[in-house]
Every structure is written in structure tokens, then in C-alpha cells.
Regions:
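N-terminal Rossmann-like NAD(P) cofactor-binding module of classical short-chain dehydrogenase/reductase
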Residues: 73-74
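Active-site-lining helix/loop region of Rossmann-like oxidoreductase modules
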Residues: 2-26, 54, 60, 142-186
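Rossmann-fold NAD(P)-binding glycine/threonine-rich loop
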Residues: 83-92, 99-124, 129-141
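Structural detector of well-ordered beta-strand residues that form the stable sheet scaffold
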Residues: 6, 31, 60, 95-97, ...
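Short acidic low-complexity segments
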Residues: 55-69
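A glycine-biased structural micro-motif
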Residues: 15, 39-43, 56
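NAD(P)-binding Rossmann-fold cofactor-contacting core
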Residues: 24-51
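Residues in the short beta-alpha loop(s) of Rossmann-like NAD(P)-binding domains
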Residues: 11, 34-37, 102
């Protein structure tokens, strides 16, 4: 039986990619998708969003409209939206994958507390194998070079990037700081 996936932010860059990947995987079923109520794709077929023929999945205007159709919610939206989705999901207890960045410490704490009490959660700023390998290499390098060096993280993004520094840059900074026995503010 396929895992029924709901994709939050299906018209965004990551949302579209996730929808395509779910549609291509025989072990997954795209059970539903949604966007912000103000998004022009709400009410239309997801195929229009993806540049594909009609696929029979309507883009809904809220998580409430699709949550009962799925087993897991995949959310790479915006920090305030992801927090609201976690709050809604606390009542429904669906598994959640959150790859959103830009959370404040309080927002992230609330999400983790909601999950601890109500639903399984995978949350990370960057889930790619390459970045997670880079994080490990940064930890090792920081331990080897130790105190004799300054560290600077420089990044570049497309102009549509909504958060800076990125979650990946923060993840790298946290790994280096931990290896050096510092905080990421040092």
C-alpha cells in the first residue's frame, strides 16, 4: 500500500519538485496538495502548476481541506505557514516532514513540542546527502584546525530566496561552533 502524501506549497519551487517526485514513485501516492488561499492556482488542476496534462488533483486553499486524505504532510513553505500547518496537524496526528527555513527559536520550539506530543516529525534545514556530508566535513575540519583559524561562511542564492542566512548556512555554522565548543553566535 502506497504512503499517501500531502504537499504544502505545491506551486512553489520545492513544492513542484516534491509533487513530481511523489507522482513518479510507485511507493507513494499524491493524495492532495494545497497553497495559500490567495494563490491563483487554488481550485485548478495540479497538472497546470506542473506543466503537465490534467492529473485529477485539485490544488486546495488550505491544509484543512486535504488533511484527512493523507498519511504524511511534506512542507517546504514559509516559517509562519509551516508553524500554522503543525498547529493544525496536532489535532490530526499525521506524520510531518518540514524542510522550511527561517524559523525563530520560539517557532521551532513550538513545532518540536507539538510534534513531541502529537505526531511524528522529520525537520531539517537541508536534507540532501551532499549538504549533510559537508556538515560532517566541517565538524571534522573545525576540530582539526581548532582555535587557530577564523571561520566565514559565504553563500549565494537566486533572487527569490526568502531567508538569509539560509538554513543550510546556519546548519554549517552550528556544526562548526559545536565542534569548537562555541555557540553559533561566536
Amino acid at each position: 500500500m502506497a504512503i499517501r502524501v500531502i504537499v504544502a506549497g505545491c506551486a512553489g519551487r520545492m513544492g513542484q519538485t516534491i509533487c513530481r517526485l511523489v507522482l513518479a514513485d510507485s511507493e507513494l501516492e499524491l493524495a492532495g496538495c494545497f497553497e495559500a488561499k490567495t494563490n491563483p492556482y487554488v481550485g485548478r488542476d495540479l497538472g497546470e502548476v506542473l506543466g503537465m496534462p490534467h492529473i485529477g488533483i485539485k490544488v486546495e486553499g488550505s491544509l484543512d481541506e486535504v488533511i484527512e486524505k493523507g498519511d504524511v504532510i511534506v512542507d517546504f513553505t514559509f516559517h509562519t505557514a509551516s508553524l500554522e500547518h503543525a498547529r493544525i496537524n496536532a489535532k490530526h496526528k499525521k506524520a510531518m516532514v518540514i524542510g522550511t527555513t527561517g524559523f525563530t527559536k520560539d517557532e521551532l520550539s513550538e513545532i518540536h513540542e507539538l510534534a513531541r506530543q502529537n505526531f511524528p516529525l522529520v525537520q531539517d534545514y537541508n536534507m540532501s546527502t551532499g549538504v549533510n556530508l559537508l556538515v560532517k566535513l566541517c565538524e571534522i575540519t573545525a576540530r582539526v584546525l581548532s582555535q587557530g583559524y577564523d571561520v566565514e561562511i559565504i553563500e549565494a542564492h537566486h533572487r527569490m530566496k526568502k531567508d538569509a542566512p539560509s538554513g543550510t548556512a546556519l546548519k554549517l555554522a552550528q556544526a562548526i561552533a559545536k565542534a569548537l565548543g562555541r555557540t553559533d553566535k561566536d
